[in-house]
Amino acid sequence: MQKKKFKITPLERAWILYDVGNSAFVLMIATLVPIFFNALAEAGGVSKVNYLAYWGYASSVVTVVTAVLGPILGTLADTKGFKKPIFMLCLFVGVLGCCAMGAARTWLPFLVIFIVAKIGFSGSLVFYDSMLGDVTTPERMDMVSSRGYAWGYIGSCVPFVVCLVLVLGSGAIGMSQMTALTIALFITAVWWLGTTLPLLRRYRQVNYVEVEQHAIRQSFVRIGHTLKHLYEDKQVFWFLLAFFCYIDGVYTIIDMATAYGTALGLDTTGLLLALLVTQIVAFPSALIFGRLSAKYPSSQLIPVCIAAYTGIAVFAFFLTQQWQFWVLAVLVGMFQGGVQALSRSHFAKIIPAEKSGEYFGLFDICGKGASFLGTMIVSVGSQLTGSANVGVGSIAVLFVIGFVLFRVSCRTEHAKQV
């Protein structure tokens, strides 16, 4: 009976496969792309401290734009027949941008293309996350969401290992590293698009609002109404505030891990292999958290992940040697998938299903949009002190605040049930 309960359906499997595809792009952005940018920046005379700062500023631009567009597109996507086409638009922007990054040969155009590609990727996640309520039932959401992240972590290793061997072994086959990185970006884009095809074929929007006249204008009206009355649902309100804080730190660590290690002067090959270990460790860890969700509510598991990340941020403050980065990579892998998957499914269960796109637009503001603050903390802290450790270590305060606010949300939920 237990196995039958958690047997993945074809539609759920297609949804999970998109995590496998887009996670390859995430891994590329976290590993090889910063190295590509570092090479271009060095050729352009950019210092190591400013290299980290410019990378952080570019990430901040992405999150601000995503924060503005996310709820607007999400609200529009709740309209019958809109979600899938807008998802496809964002997907193609991301995939084409991934290919185009390889054509850049100076650091500034590269950053511009990176921003466009990352906006397309982030936009696609608004619709992808909101599809969870269409592809599965509330009691299966924790498990399906966890499996999405789990298979995303391990599946993304397939193209990444190919790309890593190509880049590290480029000299042995008479190829320049820049050419190898260009090919690696193309491989990633093809993988991302290919693994999305089953979802494009199978997905049908189940929860929606009917088509209205002036649909775009009405989407603004609906989101205005939701924002106006958001505080009335205190469970959702306090959760979003908590999520804004703790996931900010999570995404900042993901976005800037390689850039941080490079700024500290750590060995490039060691950094890449350490981050590959993160993906491998994250696979069983996410599955474990998914199984734990069958015994313990997400309201108990999420605080465990937040507390662990607080310790990780403090540890990063003292990081100076490569073996410490390996420890950091393992620790991040243990809790990264759990906090992301459980937060997504927890939110999906406490919002109106027919307004999933609208609410996940807000979720995206408080998620990837929130990492504007974290990346700015790292960038400004690094430039003011001349030390990357200070900037990265200071994000621990975001996890502490997020932990407290999440407990407030849980108490609100308990009061509502009573």
Feature locations, PLM:
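Juxtamembrane intracellular "pre-TM" segments in multi-pass secondary transporters
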Residues: Q2-E12, R204-L241
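Helix-loop boundary and gating motifs at the non-cytosolic
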Residues: K5-T63, Q235-D267, L271-A274
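Glycine-rich segments within core transmembrane alpha-helices of 12-TM secondary carriers
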Residues: S145-V167, D364-G374
